């Protein structure tokens, strides 16, 4: 069996924040809340301009409390 697709899904960064671009937007796969670094996260007092990879290790989705590892990378903005 080919394992090329096992453990991966389109948009996954596999919890490796080092693979993310500074301007990467990510979406919670539980509630679809979007983290946009241009906006930051006012709930967690994350300043605009903060990349997803620079979020604190304890950061969670402000909408559903999902773990950061549950986020998927979104494609480029149109």
Curated annotation (Swiss-Prot):
Give the Gene Ontology MF terms in alphabetical order. electron transfer activity; iron ion binding
What InterPro entries is this protein classified in?
Answer: Rubredoxin-like_dom, Rubredoxin_dom, Rubredoxin_ET, Rubredoxin_Fe_BS
List, separated by semicolons, the cofactors it needs. Answer: Fe(3+)
Q: Which UniProt keywords apply?
A: Electron transport, Iron, Metal-binding, Plasmid, Transport
Name it.
Rubredoxin
Name a single GO biological process. Answer: alkane catabolic process
SUPFAM superfamilies hit by this protein: Rubredoxin-like
Query: Which intervals hold domain Rubredoxin-like?
Result: 23-74
Please list the coiled coil stretches: none
Sum up the protein's function in the record's words: Rubredoxin is a small nonheme, iron protein lacking acid-labile sulfide. Its single Fe, chelated to 4 Cys, functions as an electron acceptor and may also stabilize the conformation of the molecule. Could be involved in hydrogenase-linked redox processes.
One Pfam family, please name it: Rubredoxin
The keyword Transmembrane appears for this protein: no
Q: What does the record note about the cofactor?
A: Binds 1 Fe(3+) ion per subunit.
Q: Which family does it belong to?
A: Belongs to the rubredoxin family.
Q: Which residues bind Fe cation?
A: 28, 31, 61, 64
